[in-house]
Amino acid sequence: MSSTPSNQNIIPLIKKESIVSLFEKGTRQDGRKLTDYRPLSITLDYAKKADGSALVKLGTTMVLAGTKLEIDKPYEDTPNQGNLIVNVELLPLAYETFEPGPPDENAIELARVVDRSLRDSKALDLTKLVIEPGKSVWTVWLDVYVLDYGGNVLDACTLASVAALHNTKVYKVEQDSNGFRVNKNEVVGKLPLNHPVVTVSIAKVDKYLIVDPDLDEESIMDTKVSFSYTPDLKIVGIQKSGKGSMSLQDIDQAENTARLVAVKLLEELKKQLGI
């Protein structure tokens, strides 16, 4: 079973004291302010064999998301909606404690949070993925791979997922005596993405709240809270991780900070996606 670096790494006390001493001065090891995000870059259409893909680099954290569309049956409780299935894998090359094999509880949690943020925000209009109501719909497989774990992988997974969905091609559907089939030679459009969604994570280290923690900062954090936002700044997901606790005042302060960061992050995401 894999362990995330924040659970596995033990930074020597002297290094923690050094990091916290920088927080006292309002700065960090990489020169950022406490509320600054690391540099973000998004490369679209990175995996040519996928129907849509995006490579996200957030500092040293690197995540690849890819999509595949296939004709399928709708779920019984949502006969007039397409299906979205999110998977996350922590690849062994991403960090020394990650092991090969089926997704562990950390990967499953990441997938669940990303899935919930996409669904609750209605970022993807699943009703427009219906081919024949109650019988045939598009199933969107969204596979997310953590290639390099440099901290704050959840935010990067959300960014990569949204970018890959935005970049996903929809092919022509043809019908014959055997039913529906996909004509991969003809693209009819892209996935009906209503709007982007972003996740902003805030870590608490001693008395300090820091945005977008890197690997060292996650290794010494007490706890972390992540907020997912739509462009109108509606909260569509909250996730706490880490063994420590946050007071109501901490949570309120963290959300106020995350909201301000989300505005800038959404602008940057839209810019890089060209929307």
Swiss-Prot record:
What the record says about family reads: Belongs to the RNase PH family. Rrp42 subfamily.
Does the keyword Coiled coil feature in the UniProt annotation?
Answer: no
What does the record list as GO biological process?
rRNA catabolic process
What Gene3D superfamilies has UniProt attached to this entry?
GHMP Kinase, N-terminal domain (3.30.230.70)
Where is this protein found? Cytoplasm
UniProt keyword terms in alphabetical order: Cytoplasm, Exosome
| Organism name | Saccharolobus islandicus (strain M.14.25 / Kamchatka #1) (Sulfolobus islandicus)
List residues traversing the bilayer: none
Its function? Non-catalytic component of the exosome, which is a complex involved in RNA degradation. Contributes to the structuring of the Rrp41 active site.
Recorded name of the encoding gene: rrp42
Record-given protein name: Exosome complex component Rrp42
Show the Pfam families listed in the entry: RNase_PH, RNase_PH_C
Which InterPro entries does this one have?
Answer: ExoRNase_PH_dom1, ExoRNase_PH_dom2, ExoRNase_PH_dom2_sf, Exosome_comp_Rrp42_subfam, PNPase/RNase_PH_dom_sf, Ribosomal_Su5_D2-typ_SF, Rrp42_archaea
Top-level taxonomy: Archaea, Thermoproteota, Thermoprotei, Sulfolobales, Sulfolobaceae
Give the CC-aspect GO terms. cytoplasmic exosome (RNase complex)
- Summary of subunit composition and partner proteins: Component of the archaeal exosome complex. Forms a hexameric ring-like arrangement composed of 3 Rrp41-Rrp42 heterodimers. The hexameric ring associates with a trimer of Rrp4 and/or Csl4 subunits.
Predominantly, its location class is cytoplasm
Instruction: Determine if Cell wall biogenesis/degradation is one of this entry's keywords.
Output: no
One annotated GO molecular function is: mRNA 3'-UTR AU-rich region binding
